[in-house]
Amino acid sequence: LKVANSGEENQADTSSKNAKQQSNTELAFTLEKSRSTQPTHWRIHAAQKMSNTKKPFIFTQYDPEWCATPYGGGGCMGTAGCGILATVNAVYALNGQYMDVMELANYAVEKNYRIVGSGTDDGIFKAAAKKYGQKYGFAWDGASGSIDVLKKKLKAGDTAIVHVQGHYVSISDYNKKTKKYLLLDSNYLPKRATSAFGDWIGVNRLLSGALESQYFYFFKSSEL
């Protein structure tokens, strides 16, 4: 299945996010040093990862480090980078490894996964695992349109990228007691009722509305 994501988010929607949310997001990223002084390949400490499991960190499309950067000759990362950021968030939630956002974006452009005016082709997810999996400790674990498969994969420790209406998000966990899924949205907007720090949502939200899921793409951990 090839899904050309219509992920060119409305610029007005993106710019309407309030300054407080952006400030909180930037503050949350500062683990020890700024990104500009760190190598592109780093791993968070176990204590930080445990903390992020309870309050997951989300890399956003409008981070000033890449928001205005052109993405493939049309549009920018802030409006069209959801497929890239969903991949980064899925890997980070999986094992604490940060993939360089623009390295992945440039790879998508180079290999023609960037579709100007439409977003990012879903082939990037398997390709990213093949290209960067060994470096960042993850592997491709298939794709499905089934909620039951999603639940099974999450219980086994996978994370998922989800194609919803005109957008990609990530799902990093499933709570058996509440029967809810932990969703990470790199461009949280009122129309999706998502937030900066992840949202536990019921299956009903994955079956209808702005988060109606069309397909799931899975990553599993592998040896570095």
Task: Pin down the residues of each PLM region.
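Active-site-adjacent structural segments surrounding the nucleophilic cysteine of cysteine proteases
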Residues: 1-115
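Conserved active-site-adjacent core of cysteine acyl-enzyme catalytic domains
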Residues: 7, 92-224
